[in-house]
């Protein structure tokens, strides 16, 4: 039987948003259900994000989490969650000026 990763094992390198890949940083506003989230992105738009099956089973998402989001490029404002950042990774993103601290506080204050 295969062993799962330990709780304190390293996850590898933290992926960053890339304009070449089309990814952007978003904050979970609401958990809709059935594997979907409503996310507020750094461009000010609200999108409907789908959680892929491999993440749905292993990574729990809740309101206020910062995620890396890949829009599908269609007009209906939908896309897919690529990665969920941990608390220390969010602090690094704020320090690197990739994520506005006001956006994080705005969503945290609305809860």
Curated annotation (Swiss-Prot):
GO terms for molecular function: RNA binding; translation initiation factor activity. Belongs to the eIF-1A family. Residues 12-86 form the S1-like domain. PROSITE patterns: IF1A, S1_IF1_TYPE. Keywords: Initiation factor, Protein biosynthesis. This is Translation initiation factor 1A. Seems to be required for maximal rate of protein biosynthesis. Enhances ribosome dissociation into subunits and stabilizes the binding of the initiator Met-tRNA(I) to 40 S ribosomal subunits. NCBIfam families: PRK04012.1-1, PRK04012.1-3. It comes from the Archaea.
């Amino acid at each position: 039987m295969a062993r799962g990763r330990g709780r304190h094992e390293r996850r590898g390198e933290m992926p960053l948003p890339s304009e070449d890949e089309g990814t952007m940083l978003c904050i979970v506003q609401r958990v809709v259900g059935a594997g979907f989230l409503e996310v507020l992105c750094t461009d000010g738009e609200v999108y409907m994000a789908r959680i892929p099956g491999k993440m749905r089973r292993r990574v729990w998402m809740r309101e206020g989490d910062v995620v890396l989001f890949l829009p599908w490029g269609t007009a209906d404002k939908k896309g897919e969650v690529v990665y969920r950042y941990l608390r220390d990774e969010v602090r690094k993103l704020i320090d690197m000026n990739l994520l506005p601290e006001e956006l994080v506080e705005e969503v945290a204050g609305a809860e």
